[in-house]
């Protein structure tokens, strides 16, 4: 017997949204900006990596970011993650510090979080593109409408999901998460500006696994392998 989750995919829950005129306008805007010679991150092929790597039916945990990294070779479509060989930015360093303090896992030499994504951790930014060197430059081109729809579709997910909301921006999205089967954990943002105010010490990784266990869902192996392809 197939469950409701197994019959739903990103295509079934977002297919109609992608037909909306505003969605095509976003893609056209990004295309036009690239054509005009502007550097846009992440590369075109990586924009929807979060949805490609973490199937709707497999989602267990959601970590929300604001927008992609705006430096060279960093962003590749997963919130907080950077490509192999690129130094971990400060927020990600603090995530690793907390992971080490919480679960005792060693701090990796890279910041490539694909292993999390493939286990059911959706690493979703609210805006999916950004202009080089200009944080939040694409915050108002329509992405938020689309990613709010993503969150609303997760609220309807038939399995319990743990949402990790770090910082006031992510926490505002909790109003979209109304289904009582889900669990929400909140903490300050891991940025150096706020990490010491309660992100460090939040123990969200062990708490998420405990909640998944209570919901009868498999836990996440948060430890990252030293070798990445």
From Swiss-Prot:
Recorded name of the encoding gene: ung
Keyword DNA repair on entry: yes
NCBIfam families: PRK05254.1-1, PRK05254.1-2, PRK05254.1-4, PRK05254.1-5, ung
Broadest EC class assigned to this enzyme: hydrolase
PROSITE patterns assigned: U_DNA_GLYCOSYLASE
Predominant cellular place of this UniProt entry's protein: cytoplasm
Function summary: Excises uracil residues from the DNA which can arise as a result of misincorporation of dUMP residues by DNA polymerase or due to deamination of cytosine.
Catalytic activity: Hydrolyzes single-stranded DNA or mismatched double-stranded DNA and polynucleotides, releasing free uracil
Keywords, in A-Z order: Cytoplasm, DNA damage, DNA repair, Hydrolase
Active site (record annotation): 67 (proton acceptor)
Pfam families associated with the record: UDG
Protein's UniProt keywords contain Cytoplasm: yes
GO molecular function, one term: uracil DNA N-glycosylase activity
Gene3D superfamilies: Uracil-DNA glycosylase-like domain
Places the protein is found: Cytoplasm
EC number in record: 3.2.2.27
InterPro entries: UDG_fam1 (IPR002043), Ura-DNA_Glyclase_AS (IPR018085), Uracil-DNA_glycosylase-like (IPR005122), Uracil-DNA_glycosylase-like_sf (IPR036895)
Family of the protein in this entry: Belongs to the uracil-DNA glycosylase (UDG) superfamily. UNG family.
Name of the featured protein: Uracil-DNA glycosylase
GO BP terms in the entry: base-excision repair, AP site formation via deaminated base removal
GO cellular component: a single term: cytoplasm
